[in-house]
Amino acid sequence: LTANQKSKTIVTTHFEKKLPKSDYLTLCSVTLPYNDPVLYKEFLSHEECKLLIKLALEKGLDVSKVKDDQKSETRTSQTCWLSDRDHPFLYQFFLRVQNLLGIDKSNFEQLQVVQYKPTGYFRGHYDQCFLKDKYCKEELKTFKGKPRDKTFMIYLTDPKSYRGGETFFPMLDKSFKEPIGTALLFENLDTTKQYIHPKAYHQGSDVLSGEKWICNLWIRS
């Protein structure tokens, strides 16, 4: 590499490869700035959490898929997608998130409600796909080039009602299993919003008994 090229690269944790800064949505160095996850206690009431589960059950759950809508052994759960038009509460829910984060709800995906039964899990992953993958390019086209900047996850069941099922961030050495109605907001990119940050890598640990319900709202801004 020339001196000029070296000045335009960052070292990544992915096989220690050096990537041009123009390589949007690649994995950056763990040393780049990253905003830690934030908890919002009692974002939803117990009754509102029960309502979301009820709405998902009424609409119907399908086997969760990852990467280009394919089933995968990396995830064993059931999923339902809900829009702000499906129920008056959902419209209010999207507005509540918009007001909390100061981001217009036009940047939100549909709400994903997820059920994990015993032995259910989601192995380590990033919520934002890598641009090198063909399906990722197609996904970005669908969302007008906007990546999944943030994940807004809400715990819908009492943590005492199931064993296991923690949300674990290995690069942060942090684990979350929060009270019902608590929201967890975490970033998927570094602070420049150009690269996928290693600290965003996380997993849904195995549910050993009981049922775990969460919902995910992905924000593209």
Task: Please annotate each region the language model reported.
Residues 1-221:
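Fe(II)/2-oxoglutarate oxygenase catalytic core
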